[in-house]
Amino acid sequence: MGFETLAKDDSELQPTTRFRLIDIAGMLSPTSLVLFAVTVVTLSAWAQRSLTAPTAVAKNGGSAQSFREVVDETGRTVRIPQPAMRIVSLAPSMTETVYALGLQDRLVGDTDYCDYPPEAQKKQKVGGAINPSLEEIAHLRPDVVLVTRHLNTMDTVHSLDALGIPSYATDPRNVDEIVASAKRLGEVLGAPEAGAALAEDLQHRLNVLQQKIGALPPRRVLFVVWTDPLISIGKDTFIADALRRAGAVSIIDSKQDWPQVNLEEVAHLQPEVLVFADSHAEQTAPHLDVLATRPAWRILNAVRDRNFAVISEAVNRPAPRIVTAIEELAEKLHPEAFVGKPAANKVSGNTVGNKKCLCAR
């Protein structure tokens, strides 16, 4: 996966259909497979990642402000003021994590695509994630700019370096690393207690979920990223790991992050459930109706039986809210493990108006 880049410019990120191409930061894009090539190019530009936790070295340097040297998740050494009181986020996942840490008052700017929580939309905008306005960023006088290896580019990082603005990059590859990354970010921003508390809560919820569904056989699913052409997820993506945590297993056994597959191959594997990520389930339902009428798709038993699971788009972002999406999918796939939950959570038993599908809450 990538430094979150799946588009050449922000004009490619405007949604035009409910079955939109999603990047792993959770932004929605209608463009073609050229987006995936950009991811590969971006990856090659980044330094080899390091899982070394940030190491604190307090430095006064003759000034009144204290600094700390940290090693970010791509192996870069960064010098950050402590505590970091003015933060700019260049990725939706980073914005969500800042809010989850309770540090939203320090967030002075974010991108046009930082839409969660809703309050984040009121922050000063610095443009898109791919080509942010360096002038706007500099005007905000940030102590640190938060970026991700999956979305932002090395050009942006180099430009920030030239302006003397430190940037800290994350690069989580699975759910455990997302939790660890949130904790580490709290430390980097000078709020270690908040980071530890957030990570502890997320891990506790994952442990509770494992106790509920760990002994149940996993449901075989197809995670649908894009319908035409049909694109799914690779087995080493953090989304695939999220599915496993929810008691599911992707039928696509590919090392590519975003493999294009054909329906005949899927028909041979016959997934039990098709999983879609969209926070606007009621708008998604009509499109599932159309999908269910297409002869090419009706070779799948899950389509004929309308075994669709629609969950929150949070599953697409390497941020704390992914745990909520995991819990959501687990309840839909394994309702028997959740005492007191309504039968409507079953894969084949939910409705949106007269439209039968599983809806994200």
List the model feature ranges, each with a label.
Residues 17-34:
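Bacterial N-terminal signal peptides that target proteins for export
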Residues 30-44:
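Bacterial N-terminal signal peptides
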Residues 44-59:
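Signal peptide processing junction and immediate N-terminal pro/mature segment
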Residues 63, 67, 76-77, 143-144, ...:
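Extracytoplasmic substrate-binding proteins
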Residues 67, 85-151, 156, 251-255, ...:
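A short, structured surface patch at a secondary-structure boundary
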Residues 91, 149-150, 225, 255, ...:
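Short secondary-structure boundary segments
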Residues 111, 235-259, 278, 309:
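His/Asp/Glu-enriched short active-site or ligand-binding loop at hydrolase and phosphoryl-transfer sites
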Residues 134-141, 163, 261-270:
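Short helices/loops that flank or line small-molecule/ion binding pockets
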